[in-house]
């Protein structure tokens, strides 16, 4: 016999799923500001990224595995279409981050910006470390996307930085086998032409220069959709309890480049392929070229 608590829990779960369905189904009917408010509210309805992902999956009837004949066309070469290097494209240049940070991480951000304003800035990718996810979304390099029924590859030009999204029905690896990874472990499902992704098992990092830190407890939920012939849009919710007071929602977008002559290519390159000396971190927390010299002094 069901207890009152069990029935209440079940009703609450159904209510949240229904609310999720309503919010997601109405987002395209709203102006951008109202849409963002609704999507932020959706994130706050769910305690964890896993909870939001599960609700979206239930709303989609469990999701589906696409056949090769029904795959969306994401071919081409893309670039981030707005936002500069701000993690939230709606953040105006010089304005505070739109993330609601815990006091400790707010202080970290303020120090990072103050240091940068004084010329003291360190970026892990200066020594060719991968940007990692969720920073991956903001990197200003060309991107390419390969979609198959069982997995989707999200490819960033720098060092062939690839996110692998498994859509064959598998779950995340068992908790006992997890450890932090730059791009984490990503599973997903298709809801019509929308790819819904949950990523966990991430390493700590920064969203971008002059942007906040994230911890190795960070997790994300993304909804990718091609909204017209040349635009891929992504709704992103970031959950990171040590750093964020509430989930951070942003909308990312990537524009397909004109390539009528088929000459555009994604090419492997890394930050060591330049004429500069090796970059090192200074004692003061900034960056400097090791043994830096201007030009060839005294050489041929």
What are these language model-derived features?
Residues 2-5, 23-27:
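Conserved, well-structured beta-alpha core segment at the onset of a catalytic domain
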Residues 25-300:
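PEST-like low-complexity, intrinsically disordered acidic/proline/serine-rich tracts
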